[in-house]
């Protein structure tokens, strides 16, 4: 089969779903490439988008494919009274694709690994779609080795790893890679304990920041306590 991929959001950041889809089809012996236009025939084309139409307008469906599959959070976000909502039709990737190690070769311009080792968040912030999409309990979904193939930098996409009951295991897995770790999502200072700080201090940290989603929360004491043991 000839498989075409369309990253509707553009190529400013690797699309994890498309990387897994590519890995799955290549493992089956299919030819996978970025969709090249309507001059070429494709057996199947995948269109994926993370962001809503407000940020990533949809693209016309290919006319030269036997089948087109459109997926990703961006196709299921709707605006109501100025607020984004996720509809109930959103579906995860099939387990046989979700379990694939990402195919980094489709994004050669990026030399880092990306990982999503836990999903869900207990905070349910009104501006965030993680809780309705992934649940209000942070839970481990993968090991770091399922994403990392020796890259010197790992960008961690976990929405709230500090809320995960398996965070000790996950943080130490990241540490043990010896790679530079970049937490792309804010860590939750309210859930950080001494063991967490020790694990963070033992990593090669490229970037770390904290989510302060409710300005009415007085977290000054938490930040003062953290600063005394802050990561180097």
Regions found by a protein language model. Name each.
Residues 1-70, 74-77:
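A short, structured N-terminal alpha-helical element that caps or precedes a catalytic domain
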Residues 15, 43-45, 57-58, 77-88, ...:
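Short, charged, surface-exposed secondary-structure boundary motifs
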Residues 42-45, 126, 152-154, 206:
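Conserved acidic residues
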Residues 66-102:
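Ser/Thr/Gly-rich flexible loops in soluble cytosolic domains mediating phosphotransfer, phosphorylation
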Residues 107-146:
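Canonical Radical SAM [4Fe-4S] cluster-binding loop centered on the CxxxCxxC motif
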């Amino acid at each position: 089969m000839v498989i075409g991929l369309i990253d509707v959001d553009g190529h400013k950041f690797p699309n994890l779903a498309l990387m897994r889809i590519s890995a799955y089809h290549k493992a089956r012996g299919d030819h996978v490439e970025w969709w090249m236009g309507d001059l070429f025939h494709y057996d199947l084309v995948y269109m994926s988008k993370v962001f809503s139409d407000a940020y990533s307008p949809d693209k016309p469906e290919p006319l030269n494919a036997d089948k087109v599959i459109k997926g990703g959070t961006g196709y299921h976000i709707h605006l109501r009274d100025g607020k984004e909502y996720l509809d109930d039709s959103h579906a995860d990737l099939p387990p046989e694709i979700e379990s694939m190690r990402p195919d980094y070769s489709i994004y050669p311009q990026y030399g880092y690994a990306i990982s999503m080792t836990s999903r869900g968040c207990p905070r349910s912030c009104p501006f965030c779609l993680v809780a309705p999409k992934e649940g209000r309990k942070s839970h481990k979904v993968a090991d770091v080795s399922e994403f990392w193939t020796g890259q010197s930098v790992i960008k961690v996409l976990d929405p709230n790893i500090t809320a995960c009951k398996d965070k000790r295991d996950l943080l130490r897995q990241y540490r043990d890679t010896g790679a530079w770790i970049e937490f792309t999502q804010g860590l939750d200072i309210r859930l950080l304990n001494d063991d967490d700080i020790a694990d963070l201090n033992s990593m090669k940290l490229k970037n770390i920041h904290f989510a302060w989603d409710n300005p009415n929360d007085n977290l000054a004491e938490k930040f003062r306590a953290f600063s005394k043991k802050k990561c180097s």
